[in-house]
Amino acid sequence: MKTYFQKPQEVQRKWYIIDARDKIVGKVAEKVACLLRGKHKEVFSPHVDTGDHVIVINASKAIFSGKKETQKLYSAYSGYIGGQKTFSPVQIRQKRPNFIIEHAVRGMIPHNRLGRKIYTKLHVYEGSDHPHAAQKPIPVTLD
């Protein structure tokens, strides 16, 4: 019996929606990364993009476990001397509430060309409104 690899044009992509309200950031990101990569499908292979589109709503209301809300730091470097800045999750939430979920998911998918393509199927929204109602997204609960 030959091994079957699904071609990218044969993939049936679905849309999923996850509500991040009062959910732990890492658990949301883990589920999102799994759906984006397509690891929940029987035809998954690591070198083919078999994943689905994922919508995350209420990203600004996701929580951290433990003391990460006060102790965790995100860093950014401008490339100039003295250009390294650190931000706490509280500061990030004020400026870009979607960044926390996006950053966590980005760390859980491959860091290569395929990962960049997979990442384009992630849609994160601060509130509960999103423009993808026409796609009829399937609600996903975190177990």
UniProtKB/Swiss-Prot annotation:
<dbReference type="InterPro" id="IPR036899">
    <property type="entry name" value="Ribosomal_uL13_sf"/>
</dbReference>
<dbReference type="InterPro" id="IPR023563">
    <property type="entry name" value="Ribosomal_uL13_CS"/>
</dbReference>
<dbReference type="GO" id="GO:0003729">
    <property type="term" value="F:mRNA binding"/>
</dbReference>
<dbReference type="InterPro" id="IPR005822">
    <property type="entry name" value="Ribosomal_uL13"/>
</dbReference>
<dbReference type="GO" id="GO:0022625">
    <property type="term" value="C:cytosolic large ribosomal subunit"/>
</dbReference>
<dbReference type="GO" id="GO:0006412">
    <property type="term" value="P:translation"/>
</dbReference>
<comment type="subunit">
    <text>Part of the 50S ribosomal subunit.</text>
</comment>
<comment type="function">
    <text>This protein is one of the early assembly proteins of the 50S ribosomal subunit, although it is not seen to bind rRNA by itself. It is important during the early stages of 50S assembly.</text>
</comment>
<comment type="similarity">
    <text>Belongs to the universal ribosomal protein uL13 family.</text>
</comment>
<keyword id="KW-0687">Ribonucleoprotein</keyword>
<dbReference type="InterPro" id="IPR005823">
    <property type="entry name" value="Ribosomal_uL13_bac-type"/>
</dbReference>
<keyword id="KW-0689">Ribosomal protein</keyword>
<dbReference type="GO" id="GO:0017148">
    <property type="term" value="P:negative regulation of translation"/>
</dbReference>
<dbReference type="Pfam" id="PF00572">
    <property type="entry name" value="Ribosomal_L13"/>
</dbReference>
<dbReference type="GO" id="GO:0003735">
    <property type="term" value="F:structural constituent of ribosome"/>
</dbReference>
<protein>
    <recommendedName>
        <fullName>Large ribosomal subunit protein uL13</fullName>
    </recommendedName>
</protein>
